[in-house]
Amino acid sequence: WKDRNFIFKKYDYEKRSCFSIFSRCCCTCKKNKIEHYSDKEALEFHNSNKSGKIEINSSKPMTSKRDLALAYSPGVAAPVKEIFKNPERAYDYTTKGNLVAVISNGSAILGLGNLGAIASKPVMEGKAVLFKRFADIDAIDLEIDSKDPEEIVNSIKNFAVSFGGINLEDIAAPDCFIIE
């Protein structure tokens, strides 16, 4: 964290506190010169080994039937009941406290313009891996296929409970101000 400049923003969606983290340094620089890559090299990078840049791994051992039973059914019943009694316990028993949603509708992609939600996916995946690499925060990209600010806000409100943070990215003005 000390090598990057981060800005924290707090949101209160129906008494649910969420935070958003934005990093300011996102380019590869050498002595103030940005490195350039060919389109072919960039496409090969994004398609090498597995497509995309994100994968999900278990933080617990999954080597026995017992591990699987604890991770899913019937083992999840105990934390489910605890979270039901006290929703704040979700931070203790789930990834919520270290999980950020990186959200876009693709209406203002990195100087490329309005190319749509699915076209923004490589950028959102890229931001998610920056969170992991530089802050050890797990992040997942969510592309919302809508240009309606109210619909976007409602979508975010509905799934915000799953995340400790929300990062809004590449949403065109003036909608970005309405949504934030």
Where in the sequence are the language-model features?
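N-terminal ligand-binding/catalytic initiation module
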Residues: 30-180
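Intrinsically disordered, low-complexity regions of eukaryotic proteins
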Residues: 4-5, 14
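Acidic, proline/serine/threonine- and glycine-rich low-complexity intrinsically disordered segments
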Residues: 14-23, 28
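General helical secondary-structure elements
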Residues: 11-12, 123
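Exposed, low-complexity/repetitive linear segments and helix-based recognition motifs
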Residues: 9-11, 32
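Intrinsically disordered, low-complexity segments enriched in serine/threonine/proline/glycine
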Residues: 6-9, 21
